[in-house]
Protein backbone atom coordinates (compact mmCIF):
# COMPACT_ATOMS: atom_id res chain seq x y z
CA UNK A 1 0.00 0.00 0.00
CA UNK A 2 1.34 3.41 -0.92
CA UNK A 3 -0.87 6.37 -0.12
CA UNK A 4 0.93 9.43 -1.41
CA UNK A 5 -1.73 12.03 -2.20
CA UNK A 6 -4.32 11.70 0.57
CA UNK A 7 -1.93 11.38 3.49
CA UNK A 8 -4.34 13.42 5.63
CA UNK A 9 -6.36 10.21 6.02
CA UNK A 10 -3.35 8.31 7.37
CA UNK A 11 -2.56 11.13 9.77
CA UNK A 12 -6.18 11.27 10.96
CA UNK A 13 -6.23 7.59 11.91
CA UNK A 14 -2.83 7.88 13.61
CA UNK A 15 -3.93 10.83 15.77
CA UNK A 16 -4.95 9.57 19.25
CA UNK A 17 -7.46 12.44 19.53
CA UNK A 18 -9.51 10.77 16.79
CA UNK A 19 -9.96 7.43 18.60
CA UNK A 20 -13.53 8.44 19.47
CA UNK A 21 -15.69 6.21 17.24
CA UNK A 22 -18.17 9.03 16.66
CA UNK A 23 -15.53 11.19 14.95
CA UNK A 24 -15.26 11.39 11.18
CA UNK A 25 -12.96 12.89 8.59
CA UNK A 26 -14.59 14.65 5.64
CA UNK A 27 -12.31 15.04 2.66
CA UNK A 28 -12.60 15.42 -1.10
CA UNK A 29 -10.94 12.42 -2.73
CA UNK A 30 -10.65 12.38 -6.52
CA UNK A 31 -13.11 15.29 -6.62
CA UNK A 32 -15.71 13.33 -4.65
CA UNK A 33 -16.79 14.24 -1.10
CA UNK A 34 -15.83 11.36 1.21
CA UNK A 35 -16.34 10.52 4.86
CA UNK A 36 -13.81 8.33 6.62
CA UNK A 37 -14.76 6.85 9.98
CA UNK A 38 -14.00 3.91 12.24
CA UNK A 39 -16.99 2.08 10.76
CA UNK A 40 -16.26 2.54 7.08
CA UNK A 41 -15.69 4.77 4.09
CA UNK A 42 -18.40 6.46 2.04
CA UNK A 43 -18.21 8.89 -0.84
CA UNK A 44 -20.41 9.87 -3.76
CA UNK A 45 -20.87 12.64 -6.27
CA UNK A 46 -24.07 14.37 -5.09
CA UNK A 47 -27.13 13.81 -7.32
CA UNK A 48 -25.00 12.19 -10.00
CA UNK A 49 -26.54 11.20 -13.31
CA UNK A 50 -24.41 10.05 -16.19
CA UNK A 51 -24.13 7.85 -19.23
CA UNK A 52 -21.23 5.80 -20.44
CA UNK A 53 -19.23 2.77 -19.38
CA UNK A 54 -19.46 2.14 -15.66
CA UNK A 55 -17.56 -0.49 -13.73
CA UNK A 56 -18.34 -1.54 -10.18
CA UNK A 57 -15.02 -2.49 -8.62
CA UNK A 58 -16.36 -4.72 -5.87
CA UNK A 59 -14.19 -6.92 -3.72
CA UNK A 60 -15.82 -10.31 -3.10
CA UNK A 61 -16.06 -11.05 0.63
CA UNK A 62 -13.85 -8.04 1.35
CA UNK A 63 -13.68 -8.22 5.14
CA UNK A 64 -13.26 -12.00 5.24
CA UNK A 65 -10.56 -11.69 2.56
CA UNK A 66 -8.72 -9.08 4.61
CA UNK A 67 -8.97 -11.21 7.74
CA UNK A 68 -7.33 -14.12 5.93
CA UNK A 69 -4.73 -12.35 3.79
CA UNK A 70 -3.48 -10.03 6.53
CA UNK A 71 -4.15 -12.40 9.45
CA UNK A 72 -6.64 -9.96 10.98
CA UNK A 73 -9.03 -12.68 12.15
CA UNK A 74 -9.79 -12.51 15.86
CA UNK A 75 -6.82 -13.71 17.88
CA UNK A 76 -9.34 -15.73 19.90
CA UNK A 77 -10.07 -18.08 16.98
CA UNK A 78 -8.30 -21.34 17.81
CA UNK A 79 -8.09 -22.71 14.26
CA UNK A 80 -8.02 -20.02 11.52
CA UNK A 81 -7.83 -22.76 8.87
CA UNK A 82 -11.51 -23.55 9.57
CA UNK A 83 -12.42 -19.94 8.70
CA UNK A 84 -10.36 -20.23 5.50
CA UNK A 85 -12.20 -23.45 4.64
CA UNK A 86 -15.59 -21.73 5.08
CA UNK A 87 -14.35 -18.81 2.98
CA UNK A 88 -13.21 -20.97 0.06
CA UNK A 89 -16.35 -23.10 0.19
CA UNK A 90 -18.49 -19.98 0.04
CA UNK A 91 -16.63 -18.55 -2.97
CA UNK A 92 -16.93 -21.89 -4.79
CA UNK A 93 -20.68 -22.09 -4.12
CA UNK A 94 -21.14 -18.44 -5.09
CA UNK A 95 -19.37 -19.01 -8.41
CA UNK A 96 -21.76 -21.92 -9.04
CA UNK A 97 -24.69 -19.61 -8.16
CA UNK A 98 -25.62 -22.11 -5.49
CA UNK A 99 -27.96 -20.61 -2.86
CA UNK A 100 -26.17 -22.67 -0.21
CA UNK A 101 -23.46 -19.99 -0.30
CA UNK A 102 -25.70 -17.71 1.78
CA UNK A 103 -25.22 -19.44 5.18
CA UNK A 104 -21.46 -19.38 4.60
CA UNK A 105 -21.64 -15.66 3.84
CA UNK A 106 -23.49 -15.08 7.11
CA UNK A 107 -20.86 -17.01 9.08
CA UNK A 108 -18.01 -15.11 7.41
CA UNK A 109 -19.52 -11.66 7.87
CA UNK A 110 -20.84 -12.24 11.38
CA UNK A 111 -17.32 -13.17 12.44
CA UNK A 112 -16.29 -9.57 11.82
CA UNK A 113 -19.26 -8.33 13.86
CA UNK A 114 -18.39 -10.71 16.69
CA UNK A 115 -14.95 -9.13 16.87
CA UNK A 116 -16.61 -5.84 17.88
CA UNK A 117 -19.00 -7.37 20.44
CA UNK A 118 -17.50 -7.26 23.93
CA UNK A 119 -19.87 -10.03 25.03
CA UNK A 120 -18.64 -12.44 22.33
CA UNK A 121 -15.76 -14.90 22.76
CA UNK A 122 -14.26 -13.60 19.50
CA UNK A 123 -14.13 -10.02 20.79
CA UNK A 124 -10.99 -8.40 19.42
CA UNK A 125 -11.45 -4.68 18.71
CA UNK A 126 -7.86 -4.22 17.58
CA UNK A 127 -8.26 -6.78 14.81
CA UNK A 128 -11.71 -5.40 13.91
CA UNK A 129 -10.18 -1.94 13.50
CA UNK A 130 -7.35 -3.41 11.44
CA UNK A 131 -9.94 -4.92 9.09
CA UNK A 132 -12.07 -1.80 8.74
CA UNK A 133 -9.35 0.85 8.62
CA UNK A 134 -6.92 -1.30 6.66
CA UNK A 135 -9.66 -2.02 4.13
CA UNK A 136 -10.40 1.69 3.75
CA UNK A 137 -6.74 2.49 3.24
CA UNK A 138 -6.37 -0.21 0.59
CA UNK A 139 -9.38 1.23 -1.26
CA UNK A 140 -7.93 4.74 -0.93
CA UNK A 141 -4.68 3.45 -2.42
CA UNK A 142 -6.66 2.03 -5.34
CA UNK A 143 -8.55 5.31 -5.80
CA UNK A 144 -5.21 7.15 -5.98
CA UNK A 145 -4.11 4.83 -8.78
CA UNK A 146 -7.42 5.00 -10.65
CA UNK A 147 -8.28 8.69 -10.48
CA UNK A 148 -6.03 9.75 -13.37
CA UNK A 149 -7.56 7.11 -15.65
CA UNK A 150 -11.31 7.23 -14.95
CA UNK A 151 -13.94 9.17 -13.04
CA UNK A 152 -14.63 8.06 -9.48
CA UNK A 153 -18.41 8.19 -9.00
CA UNK A 154 -18.94 6.50 -5.65
CA UNK A 155 -17.03 4.52 -3.06
CA UNK A 156 -17.99 2.60 0.02
CA UNK A 157 -16.49 0.19 2.49
CA UNK A 158 -15.96 -2.63 -0.02
CA UNK A 159 -15.93 -1.16 -3.49
CA UNK A 160 -15.69 1.71 -5.95
CA UNK A 161 -17.96 2.72 -8.84
CA UNK A 162 -16.05 4.29 -11.73
CA UNK A 163 -16.91 5.67 -15.15
CA UNK A 164 -14.48 4.80 -17.92
CA UNK A 165 -13.46 7.59 -20.29
CA UNK A 166 -13.40 5.08 -23.15
CA UNK A 167 -14.51 1.47 -23.42
CA UNK A 168 -10.95 0.53 -24.35
CA UNK A 169 -9.76 1.63 -20.89
CA UNK A 170 -11.30 -1.43 -19.25
CA UNK A 171 -8.17 -3.59 -19.58
CA UNK A 172 -6.03 -0.87 -18.00
CA UNK A 173 -8.57 -0.53 -15.16
CA UNK A 174 -8.56 -4.29 -14.68
CA UNK A 175 -4.75 -4.32 -14.50
CA UNK A 176 -4.69 -1.52 -11.91
CA UNK A 177 -7.27 -3.31 -9.79
CA UNK A 178 -5.40 -6.61 -10.01
CA UNK A 179 -2.26 -5.04 -8.49
Give the residues covered by each predicted segment.
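Conserved acidic
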Residues: 1-179
Amino acid sequence: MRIEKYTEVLNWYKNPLNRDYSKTLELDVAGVPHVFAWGGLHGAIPKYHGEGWFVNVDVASYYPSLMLVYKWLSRNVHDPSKYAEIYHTRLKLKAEKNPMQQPYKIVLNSTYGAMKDKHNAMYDPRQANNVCVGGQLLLLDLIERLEDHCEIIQSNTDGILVKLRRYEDFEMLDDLCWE
